[in-house]
Swiss-Prot record:
HAMAP family, sorted: SfsA
Family annotation (InterPro entries): SfsA, SfsA_C, SfsA_N
Annotated gene: sfsA
Name the UniProt record assigns to this protein: Sugar fermentation stimulation protein homolog
Family: Belongs to the SfsA family.
An example molecular function term from Gene Ontology annotations: DNA binding
Superkingdom: Bacteria
Any Pfam family the entry gives: SfsA_N
Length: 233
């Protein structure tokens, strides 16, 4: 995924109200920018952190700048939770994710389960449909180890239970985690931060739900899925 225009460098002053952050540009201008991430962004909100912003050329937008990338410990980390679906689709089409790239039809945002939408429904004329859920990952406490979630997510646990139900019904069900940082080679669940999610993942795996973790290269120009990361359980 290539950013449509060059990103603007700034320094983080603070993040607040989940969706907002104050930053200062290189020329000293202070701005309030939107934050496309409802999670805690644990470890990524230190004042003074280098950040990269995209800009919308829309005079109707209250906040024309949007936070896209935070630098943490010398590594660029993508925080936009609207991008993982796009990155997962790129990885699937590039045949990085098992045999999912052999499904000729990829339908985004399809209704299923109880009041939910699946991120992708993959269809093949000779195979059961594949229900694919995608989650964003940017949390790292131990060098090289990506973790999810960084806060409690009851919605995420429900999605795993619904994937398990789809698998028991004879469909294929797949959980994809997209790690928006290049310094991780392993992945595990944060059972200490959300035991319920870890338990739901165990139930899903027992039901036959597949799991893949996609790693990405991050730069000021693009975010590119380029490899699978090992699950460390």
């Amino acid at each position: 995924m290539i950013f449509p225009s060059p990103l603007t460098e700034a320094r983080l002053i603070r993040r607040y109200k989940r969706f907002l952050a104050d930053v200062v540009l290189a020329d000293g201008t202070e701005l309030t920018v939107s934050v496309p991430n409802t999670g805690s962004m644990l470890g990524l909100t230190a004042p003074g952190s280098r950040v990269l912003l995209s800009k919308w050329d829309d005079p109707k937008r209250k906040y024309p700048y949007r936070l896209e990338i935070v630098e943490a410990d010398g590594t660029l980390v993508g925080i936009n939770t609207g991008l993982p679906n796009r990155l997962a689709a790129e990885a699937i089409r590039a045949r990085l994710v098992g045999d999912l790239g052999t499904y000729p039809v990829i339908r985004p945002e399809q209704r299923y389960g109880e009041r939910s939408r699946i991120d992708f429904l993959l269809e093949h004329p000779e195979r059961p449909p594949a229900y694919v859920e995608v989650k964003n990952v940017h949390f790292m406490r131990e060098a090289g180890l990506a973790e999810f979630p960084d806060t409690r997510t009851d919605r995420g646990a429900r999605h795993l239970d619904e994937l398990a139900a789809m698998r028991r019904a004879g469909n294929r069900a797949v959980m994809i985690y997209v790690v928006q940082r290049a310094d991780c080679s392993r992945f595990r669940l944060c059972a200490d931060l959300d035991a319920s999610y870890a338990a739901a993942f165990g139930r899903a795996r027992d039901a036959g739900v597949e799991a893949f973790v996609i790693g990405c290269q991050i730069s000021a120009d693009a975010i590119a899925p380029d490899r699978l990361i090992d699950l460390d359980f």
